[in-house]
């Protein structure tokens, strides 16, 4: 069962919120809810939440095992998602009187706009994700004390920052966003404006940022054949995060899904992970 809401994410700005309810929910029952963060792609939240109404959407889902917002709802969780700025229904190409971006990435354009106002794309998206979570926590059937967050690639970035900035999330799954800055940032130039903040990597590397989630439970997905975040440096990132969890005395709260696929959701441990840590 899918609901589509129009919500205010800040003053004078609205977004579409999708909510998937499990079919077996009973009246008056409370279930854990998971924020399903989408990554790059013109369709935004739609394939993640199971919209397969066009060949392009079906191709997105097949390429990245991308419909985790649908699958997790089928496994009993309430799931929800919004479009981050510049994606899906919030893509400027869909707005009246838009100006073509001449082939430039909307992520980078929005980052430039945000920095001129003293903000970043990450901070804006986190604020909008928190606003969506505020709404979801008031919906019938949602147990606001059992929230999780998960996402692939750019959605992995957002999963990381949502977990860090909103302690309501009790468990997180970061998919195909593990690496070292020298590798994905400098060697591969595999990042965009929705994934960075000024001066961040003078202070710490990506494993350090992921380690800040400790002691809360964290599941990391790494694709052996991922061409975006290469497995060698992705695993080095994981090993450094593992050291942080060991130092915190919570090694049991860190899990790895090292799957044989490319840049996509492994899906091998997600159900058990969230059911364990969201008490379901």
Where are these regions (language model features)?
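Short beta-strand/loop motif that positions the catalytic acidic residue
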Residues: 213, 220-222
